[in-house]
Amino acid sequence: MDDLDALLADLESTTSHISKRPVFLTEETPYSYPTGNHTYQEIAVPPPVPPPPSSEALNGTVIDPLDQWQPSVSRYGHQQPQSQSPIYSSSAKSSSASVPRDGLSSPSPRASEEEHVYSFPNKQKSAEPSPTMTSTSLGSNLSELDRLLLELNAVQHNPPSGFSADEVSRSPSLPNVTGPHYVIPESSSSAGGKAAPPTKEKPKRNGGRGIEDVRPSVESLLDELESSVPSPVPAITVSQGEVSSPQRVNASQQQTRISASSATRELDELMASLSDFKFMAQGKAGGSSSPPSTTPKPGSQLDTMLGSLQSDLNKLGVATVAKGVCGACKKPIAGQVVTAMGKTWHPEHFVCTHCQEEIGSRNFFERDGQPYCEKDYHNLFSPRCYYCNGPILDKVVTALDRTWHPEHFFCAQCGVFFGPEGFHEKDGKAYCRKDYFDMFAPKCGGCARAILENYISALNTLWHPECFVCRECFTPFINGSFFEHDGQPYCEVHYHERRGSLCSGCQKPITGRCITAMGKKFHPEHFVCAFCLKQLNKGTFKEQNDKPYCQNCFLKLFC
């Protein structure tokens, strides 16, 4: 606790360097901050430019109030010792930082609301500070304040050994304070009389109060730092002697305006950094007790985000009614829901089993309890066409123990689609009726065309009935008898003619004995002399002009 007291004292001394310097803003919102033991007078008509404080005011020299101010104006006494700090109280603080003297007229209610005179710890200055040095000192003081706040946070998150965790948790929290409470002693009305300097009350620290008792004091110091840059209130004009150089006043006002705005900006950045640091420290303190988590897989990041979103909504009091349990991740569904196959799904979890693409509002197919997109289902499970080997999506033709697209089932020879008459199969291929019989049906021995209906089997060949006739005279065979010569059917006459067994005299077939002469065949009774018609049976004859003659007729006729 001694280290904490030292930090608070160092913090108070740091803010006293900032608060004792008067800051002047623009003419629209002129402010003055009295330092030292001066009494200021409100002037009804303000001058065009607020005068800078004199060196006596900055150095804390006491000026006789009777010589400086008119007696008809209400006076406010502000006296602060150099070595003492303001008194801090844990109760709610008053928004006014000045207390009117006893015996003087109190300001009107409007003046008490709009005019605030702030008193800050003052130290003697040997000379008027330059604006450059003041701005540099302000930046260094803010940096020092930032460092002290970081150390204070470290002490708050790690309580001293003298405090147990139960004491810290049971320590009562103090009410919020709106600003530091300054107790200002009343000045004596007699010239030269001064009141005794007030004593500073340090924050009480005992065993019954925890680390949270220190925080109001730190917040009071921060409020004191914020009060160095005042909020806009009606102008307060201070008359404090002659202004020797208007150019110097303008330059001083511009420099102090820059310093004031810079201090405000740095203070905002400091407060933002302090909030971020507290948030990070709480996160680290909460995460130190839990074991280190492994890096989540990319596939589970979405599930983690959904789970954290639902928990955050529950913490905020937003009731999320589950619409079901997802069939994939087995987690409740709070947003959009997909109902399919008797289950409910997250839209991003209802995906194709094969390609893992989100199905959404597209058509899908079910197989063994698993959803498939239309493309993958047909590629995996649909029958394939025997002709193109592609999946069959719509109508299917089943033939020859195979499946076909209707547009791919046609005659293998002519490419014509099969009609009502159907098709014929040969060697695993389908043919139309015409091409099948033309290619594979038995051919007629007479016309060489396919035999489609009745036929005659003869001479090891099939014949149309109308085609089985004599190959010479095309006469149908009576009683079914025919003669064959060189694999062709003939009638008896043409058969003997083809073979040469036809009598040359009577032009009838020779069925018995025959005589062969002059390259011809004759019945014995039909081989006679061409002149006398006597039978030439002795075996001797004369031939003249392809005709036979007996010996006597030949001599008579030709000798």
UniProtKB/Swiss-Prot annotation:
Q: Where is the composition biased (Pro residues)?
A: 45-54
Q: What is this protein called?
A: Paxillin
The biased composition feature labelled Low complexity covers 79-98
What does the UniProt entry say about where the protein is found?
Answer: Cytoplasm, Cytoskeleton; Cell junction, Focal adhesion; Cytoplasm, Cell cortex
A single cellular component GO annotation = stress fiber
Question: Residue ranges of region Disordered?
Answer: 17-139, 158-213, 225-262, 281-301
Q: Indicate which residues form the motif LD motif 2.
A: 144-156
Name of a matching Pfam family: LIM
InterPro entries for this protein:
Paxillin_Lim_dom2 (IPR047072), Paxillin_Lim_dom4 (IPR001904), Paxillin_TGFB1I1_LIM_dom1 (IPR047075), Znf_LIM (IPR001781)
| Native species | Gallus gallus (Chicken)
What post-translational modification information does the record give? Phosphorylated on tyrosine residues during integrin-mediated cell adhesion, embryonic development, fibroblast transformation and following stimulation of cells by mitogens.
What keyword terms does UniProt attach to this protein? Cell adhesion, Cell junction, Cytoplasm, Cytoskeleton, LIM domain, Metal-binding, Phosphoprotein, Repeat, Zinc
| Motif placement: LD motif 5 | 301-313
For the keyword Zinc, the answer is: yes
Locate the motif LD motif 1: 3-15
Q: Please name the GO terms that the record assigns under molecular function.
A: metal ion binding; vinculin binding
| Keyword Repeat assigned | yes
The short sequence motif called LD motif 4 sits at 266-277
**Superkingdom:** Eukaryota
